[in-house]
Amino acid sequence: GTGNLLARNLDLPINDVEQCLRIAVGGRQRRIDTVDVRFTHEDGRVTRQTFTVIGGAGYDADIMGDTKDELKDLAGWLAYSEAGIRHLRGKRHEVTVALDGGQPRRFKVRTVMVANCGMLTGGVELLPQAKLDDGLLDVMVLSPRHALDWARIAVKTVTRSRSSIPVMHTEQAQRVKVEFAEPMPSQLDGDATGVITALDARVQPDSLVVMLVAEDDASVRDDGVSAAAPVPEPAPHI
């Protein structure tokens, strides 16, 4: 995708195609979690999908669904900032959130996100505790009321502060069910997935095998950029 978030969270050299090919054929294997999610739509349909990074409903989905394609072609992931600014103002919505079969809790939110990993574009750690292989979902509820609340969220995220703020609530669980008092737009891994009235997400531990840089591969420097090592030529057919 535009942000290449899964590759970023896996520390792959995203700007070097040759090195990525080398990793694909000769790297080391790692098992990571995926997330199975069921959406209930306005017409009562239930659809099932799988994602690897972040899914959600509300403000984040507004951004993904309203980012201009031509701007993404020009500016890449920075295009999301323009849509984000346009959608900053908006009302909060009532939702209920239940974790691991527990008692549903009510929130007034701008967005609810379910994450498998936490790094965004630009190296921003939205959920520093989120890990791709911990068998847990990271649930984030954002409930800002005005610009000052958004500023608090931005400062906490950028500075990676461990202090809690009332408008940014996070928890971990293996399963999360969210019901919306009114239909809300949704997204999975940056793709708009329509308006929904409920979601039910479950972690699928160790369900996907990915290839990573081999531990003894000296062709990748600490900054994630590959050194000038050629891709091996295929053996000639005899």
Where are each of the predicted segments found?
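ATP/nucleoside-binding phosphotransfer catalytic cores, i.e., glycine-rich phosphate-binding loops
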Residues: 99-106, 131-132, 141-238
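Gly/Ser/Thr-rich active-site loops/lids in small-molecule metabolic enzymes
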Residues: 71-79, 120-122, 128-149
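Short, flexible, solvent-exposed loop/turn segments with mixed acidic/basic and small polar residues
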Residues: 41-43, 126-131, 190
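Short beta-strand-to-turn element immediately C-terminal to the catalytic PLP-Schiff-base lysine
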Residues: 37-38, 56, 66, 114-115, ...
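Catalytic core of DAGKc-family lipid kinases
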Residues: 1-110
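Glycine-rich phosphate/pyrophosphate-binding beta-alpha loops
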Residues: 56, 60, 113-128, 192
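Short acidic/glycine-rich loop or secondary-structure boundary segments that cap or lie
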Residues: 60-63, 105-108, 120-123, 147-151
